[in-house]
Amino acid sequence: LRRQRQMCIRDRLYSVRCFNLNSWNITYAGWCLYIIVLYFFTVKLFNYRKIIRQHLSFKSDIDKLMLLPLGTIIPCWLVQSQSPIDSLKALCPHFIWLIYYLLHIWKPSEKRLLYLLGVMAIIVFFIQIIQQFTYPIVVCGTFDENEMLRKGLLEDVEIRNGLYRFRLNTNGIFTMIILFYVWGRMKTKMMMKYFIVFIILLASIYLSLTRQLIVTSLVTLILFSFCGKGIKTKIASFLFLFFLSIVLWIYFEQLFGEFIETTSSSTSEDNIRILSAIYFGTNTIMNPLTLFLGNGFPKNDTIYGRFLDDLADYWGFFPEDVGFIGYMYFYGLLYVIAYFRLAYKVLLVYRKYVPTYIKMFVVATGLISIMIYPLAGIMNYLVWSILLYICDLHIIKSSL
């Protein structure tokens, strides 16, 4: 229990960056990350024998996702002139995958981990709500001056559908997981507390003001609505979705009117995204070395980092905006294949054992992978490590 509390404290300290805290110093964040990764390595080293004695269904996948990016150091040096030391610093976040092994050492329960994810989701919701009323006095999720200049903004936040859009660096990952979990609980036993939490989480997804996230969450809920045993469960799911659809239809103009107008008038933005995908895809496949290993991940103050900044400033080309194509540019084809192999194992190989809410999360993030890569950034590494550990708990339990 003490170790679990220590883990919780460390993750909470670093998670202030996950909420994009305005006063959080990037340099301090880097040093915090180095210390956390060093600690993870040390714990794994001293518990190596305990780890190898366990059956870890996703060990090979974790190792690939953690180590394949290291292969980009060579092409990044040869093609992009970024030194191996700078590349290693830029790739340090990938070692957060080590938490998968630490969870198998500490063995927290699924209930405890879901509680922690739920707390994070509720914190996100309250930040979204409170800052709508306190802006411009806010602590999280605004652009700095450089980002405002790059995006041509007059304010440090975007306004969509009449609401402020705060970028909390979570992409709805905590919220989606708990949303899908609560949905599953509602299907088995309709209780007021589940209903209230579900509505709060659905509102939080909407307040992200990210069209892809809203659509993929709703589509996934519909796709999985009729999964499950028992006619009562399916009838309850149908009735709930029916009433939810009526509410959405009545308030459609207020909730989504500006989204529809923005989508209709965003031809230029869509064209830029297509051109960006063509550019990064072409520059990846032209060289066999970068095709398989990628161009590497840039460190901000390097020639390579400034080159990508110039692409963003002058052309609006961001690798992160084109999903797995952009991450193939960073880490190569082998890395992207490793993600799809992982998704295949969760959804098909171990489908009988994996909890439905985890399958829903994998489907939801996969549906938008052409625009938002599912394994992008520290918080995704952390959350996926937790979910894969929970999958292992169910797989091990089924074999007893």
Language-model segment annotations:
Residues T263-Y331:
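Long extracytoplasmic/lumenal interhelical loops at the membrane interface
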Residues R3-Q6, R10-T262, Y279-T282, D313-L400:
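Hydrophobic transmembrane helix bundles of membrane-integrated enzymes that assemble
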